[in-house]
A protein has these predicted regions:
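Non-transmembrane, membrane-proximal soluble domains of secreted or membrane proteins
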Residues: 1-144, 148-181, 198-212, 218-240
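"…together with the soluble PPM/PP2C metallo-phosphatase catalytic core" -> "…together
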Residues: 186
């Protein structure tokens, strides 16, 4: 049993940090400088070493079809590894009660053949087409306090880690008046397969409904209590 604690020697495991948040998962690829959320892309036939951490309370990382479960504990670091041999999507779930939205703290492991995985990594490092639309301006005005969309920029990885800590401190120490909180990195959100930590498939209709009234999807989400666009109830998207 002990011999399986670490990936096989000379196997060149992919390094990933899985950070638990109430109630979503952040996935960091430190060697590639990539930060994303709720969808863990991995190559097939290659070990993946996962460093498990938590920003707030105890969570538990669990992908039933692929690996066992292990806790993420604030102030501590746990490690596990997994290997997926067949391409496909594998459902994951927080397996430790962590608050009101625990049952909706889902994620997805997306296993791709190595060439496709490498293509995904390259796409995450590629800037999107610059958008000067009103929607982009609204995102910068209202959403960028909590969400980042620039993981492709040089130095963005270190910046994102610092910003997440600062956002958390702002909210934790001033929950009544804070205007920001830790939130998923949304770089290249459009290529994701799901939204709201696995509550709905990624479609235009679901995305609009999620932005308009997050609590209808996921009770307890802090987005609606913090972001100014929700003051007084659901966002009035028709105004925009």
């Amino acid at each position: 049993i002990y011999s399986t604690y670490e990936p096989p020697e000379n196997s060149d495991p992919l390094e990933v940090v899985a950070m638990g948040h109430q109630w979503w998962w952040e996935f960091r690829y430190p060697d590639e400088g990539i930060v994303t959320a709720n969808e863990l892309y991995v190559p097939t036939d290659r070990p993946v070493r996962i460093t498990l951490q938590s920003q707030d309370v105890i969570h538990s990382f669990w992908v039933p079809q692929v690996a066992g479960k292990k806790d993420t504990v604030p102030g501590n670091t746990n490690v596990m590894w997994l290997q997926v041999d067949e391409p496909g999507n594998y459902s994951g779930q927080c397996a430790e009660f962590c608050g009101v939205a625990h049952a909706r703290m889902r994620f997805r492991v997306i296993a791709e053949e190595e060439s496709n995985f490498n293509n995904w990594m390259e796409s995450m490092k590629t800037p999107p087409r610059m958008d000067t639309s009103e929607g982009y301006g609204l995102f910068l005005a209202h959403c960028s306090m909590c969400h980042s969309i620039d993981s492709y920029n040089e130095g963005s990885y270190e910046k994102e880690l610092t910003m997440q800590d600062e956002r958390w401190d702002d909210w934790y120490f001033n929950q009544e008046e804070s205007v920001r909180v830790s939130a998923p990195n949304l770089t290249h959100l459009g290529i994701r397969t799901m939204i709201a930590a696995g509550q709905k498939d990624m479609t235009k209709e679901n995305l609009i409904a999620w932005i308009k009234d997050p609590s209808e999807f996921k009770r307890g989400t802090r987005m609606q209590s913090v972001a100014s666009v929700y003051k007084g109830g659901p966002a009035k998207l028709e105004d925009y």
